[in-house]
């Protein structure tokens, strides 16, 4: 085994269908369900996930103001928290503090129990909202993981490990890609283009989300319209249209119109459309406190909403991004991952993350929906998403931001 080993961390988020949970896990959840509902452990870590999400977003936004952004803070945070189980010393502290946890105010056990509850909640079968997540380790067939690490990642993060022949990089690449393709039901293929020769361990984390609008758009109302990427660039996009009652709020602090659109189930998409020329102001000013207040403001108004069909993805090597958040030691020669294995010193070389967002008109009409007549439709004000905007997809049971993004150009893949 080489003395210095590169560790590949692959994080995925995409649309998929929810798979059934294991019987053992279901039985465990049933026994603890009452306690979880009264005081969910995931609620204690939710504010920290939200702070981490906005910190990560700002770093990505500073890197480029001309490209779409889309990532899953829950996916990234759960993978890093799981990895922290095998770290020690400053390496350990940096990861958890980089995720916005103060170890003098919250016990580490509470952090991991929060993620355990979060993952259990997200993976509960739901006939309305299709949502699932998971973690798996691919390890060099000659590398022995410590029993304590394996036990912890299994019990807290529902993760397992697959022996992998990393000496044959092509074989290992195909094994990982095959797992990802099967797990995403073909949504993501050939994710890993190549593996470094010294890679001996890879963590694949995924979160899949597919929601149907509580109040859908009508496919018959879709038409091509302009989307203004910037002052000099305009693209044509399929623009969806619906008139109805929406939770809409103008936030003076953010200089933005805020639209909330519910999914069937327990998730809401929050769209923030800044005034012209105010995107930078929105990005600098938005906070977890403001988002919390916006989520509570559910007063509805009549609006004609125009919204582009969106199919975007974000692919990132987050090493530099995480380093800017203070997570540096795990990428260095002095990284301490001795809680993972004692066979050889490990170093994280890459943190790869891919997230995919598809938004279209699909949905199922909810009972008791409001229908407006032609006269009311003409009187309703217009809210048109025809310029860059932000999106946060929020899951209510866990109070967590599943996805965060910025749509700069809906035609940009």
UniProtKB/Swiss-Prot annotation:
Residues 1-24 form the signal peptide. Its main location: secreted. It is found in: Secreted. The N-terminus is blocked. Residues 368-387 are annotated as: RCL. GO terms for cellular component: extracellular space. The keyword Signal applies. This is Hibernation-specific plasma protein HP-55. SUPFAM superfamilies: Serpins (SSF56574). The record marks 377-378 as: Reactive bond. SMART domains: SERPIN.
